């Protein structure tokens, strides 16, 4: 199970429980996001980082903030942590990524899904890589390590982070754990909400 599958399952579960939900992903489906999503073979380093950050800033203004103002719970499949990792794979420093993402919202919860690199490689071989990052040989070791660094970086900046290991858990178990974490955050914010 990957990040997108987990996000869909979480949104479906919370929506079925009656919570007003807004599901989104990054890169977005806006033109900037599509350029970033389909341009990983063309754009690298700072160019790709700028595309991803521009898409994130745009999406925040036109999609995420309006959904939050409407009282919806927003679940975003990928956010700043993904940029810290992917742009890190391209050799950019986390400081550079943070500069490009200055002013983005700090979410109420960031969930990092990671797994044993061999398991990640096996899953990617099974479904095929969608981007040059996923198609690269043995990239999972480096990606997993960068996610560990991203967690430390996010926490140092005051972002609430939970890390879940996908190595052995089923998709249903992972989704249930994320739903529990979101419900706990919502309960802390507004007990009447959940």
Where do the model's predicted regions map?
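ATP-binding Walker
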Residues: 1
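Walker A/P-loop
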Residues: 4
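NTP-dependent small-molecule kinase module
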Residues: 9-13, 118-194
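ATP-dependent small-molecule kinase phosphotransfer cores
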Residues: 19-99
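Conserved nucleotide-binding/hydrolysis micro-motifs of P-loop NTPases
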Residues: 28-30, 80-81, 115-121, 169
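Conserved acidic residues
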Residues: 72, 108, 161
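Conserved phosphate-donor/acceptor-positioning beta-strand/loop module used by diverse small-molecule
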Residues: 76-78, 103-124
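Substrate-engagement module of ASCE P-loop NTPases
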Residues: 96-106, 143
């Amino acid at each position: 199970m990957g990040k997108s599958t987990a996000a869909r399952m979480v949104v479906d579960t919370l929506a079925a429980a009656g919570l007003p939900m807004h599901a989104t992903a990054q890169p977005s489906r806006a033109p900037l996001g599509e350029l970033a999503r389909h341009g990983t073979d063309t754009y690298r380093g700072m160019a790709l980082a700028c595309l991803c950050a521009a898409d994130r800033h745009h999406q925040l203004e036109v999609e995420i903030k309006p959904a939050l103002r409407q009282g919806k719970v927003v679940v975003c499949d990928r956010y700043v942590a993904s940029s810290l990792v992917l742009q890190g794979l391209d050799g950019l420093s986390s400081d550079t990524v943070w500069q490009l993402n200055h002013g983005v919202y700090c979410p109420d919860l960031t969930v990092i899904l990671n797994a044993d690199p061999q398991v990640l490689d096996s899953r990617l071989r099974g479904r095929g890589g969608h981007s040059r990052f996923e198609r690269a040989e043995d990239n999972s070791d480096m990606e997993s390590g960068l996610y560990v660094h991203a967690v430390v970086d996010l926490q140092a900046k005051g972002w609430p982070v939970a890390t879940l290991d996908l190595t052995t858990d089923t998709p249903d178990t992972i989704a249930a754990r994320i739903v529990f974490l979101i419900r706990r955050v919502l309960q802390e914010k507004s007990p009447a909400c959940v």
